[in-house]
């Protein structure tokens, strides 16, 4: 069993976080979840619930631990806590800017800072469009320091029909980077 941190910031795309946490837990991994106040609002607006756990099948709850964003004293704040990867999905441009400047003023930003300084996998899923030059500079700075930047761009050649299809595709890309085996991972096969 591996241990993953999933941070959820206030950008649109709550379904991506729900899908990722559900699949990691279904695969038997421990998932530490940190939700920003803005993400709580987005969760309510997009999925009509105030409880993140209410969006996850109850049989998976045993593998999920929710942390308060203000719990800077959490063991997750320390590089001595072993974590296999940190994923922030969706990741707002405000969170990207803070991480790129090394701001660790809450648990969500701190775990990203720890991942960078400890040279552990950090996957950021920025959900913003269009991107300004400032956004691009921040993303470049993070990529140059080891972060994987994974914009939630659907793989159109798989012909998604629903929002769930798109979420599954994007989460499959995250899981592939983590080198996990999941039915959500799709591989291109030339039909001709």
UniProtKB/Swiss-Prot annotation:
InterPro entries xrefs: Flavin_trans-like, Flavoprotein, UbiX-like
Source taxon at top rank: Bacteria
This enzyme's EC code(s): 2.5.1.129
Gene3D superfamilies referenced in this protein's UniProt entry, alphabetically: Flavin prenyltransferase-like
Binding site for dimethylallyl phosphate: 157, 173
One Pfam family this sequence matches: Flavoprotein
Transmembrane segments: none
Keywords: Flavoprotein, FMN, Prenyltransferase, Transferase
Annotated binding of FMN, by residue: 10-12, 36, 92-95, 127
GO molecular function, one term: carboxy-lyase activity
Reactions catalysed according to its record: dimethylallyl phosphate + FMNH2 = prenylated FMNH2 + phosphate
Function (record text): Flavin prenyltransferase that catalyzes the synthesis of the prenylated FMN cofactor (prenyl-FMN) for 4-hydroxy-3-polyprenylbenzoic acid decarboxylase UbiD. The prenyltransferase is metal-independent and links a dimethylallyl moiety from dimethylallyl monophosphate (DMAP) to the flavin N5 and C6 atoms of FMN.
Similarity remark: Belongs to the UbiX/PAD1 family.
Protein name, as recorded: Flavin prenyltransferase UbiX
The species this protein was found in: Chlamydia muridarum (strain MoPn / Nigg)
């Amino acid at each position: 069993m591996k241990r993953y941190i999933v941070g959820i910031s206030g950008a649109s795309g709550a379904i991506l976080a729900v899908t990722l946490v559900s699949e990691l837990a279904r695969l038997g991994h421990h998932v530490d979840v940190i939700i920003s106040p803005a993400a709580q609002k987005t969760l309510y607006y997009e999925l009509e619930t105030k409880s993140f756990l209410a969006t996850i099948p109850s049989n998976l709850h045993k593998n999920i631990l929710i942390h308060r964003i203000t719990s800077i004293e959490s063991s997750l704040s320390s590089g001595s806590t072993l974590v296999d990867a940190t994923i922030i999905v969706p990741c707002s441009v405000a969170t990207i800017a803070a991480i790129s400047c090394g701001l660790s003023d809450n648990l969500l930003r701190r775990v990203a800072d720890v991942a960078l300084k400890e040279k552990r996998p950090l996957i950021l899923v920025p959900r913003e469009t269009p991107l300004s030059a400032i956004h691009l500079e921040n993303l470049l700075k993070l990529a140059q320091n080891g972060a994987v930047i994974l914009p939630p761009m659907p793989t159109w050649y798989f012909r998604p029909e629903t929002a769930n299809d798109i979420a599954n595709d994007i989460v499959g890309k995250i899981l592939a980077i983590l080198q996990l085996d999941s039915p959500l991972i799709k591989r291109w096969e030339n039909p001709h």
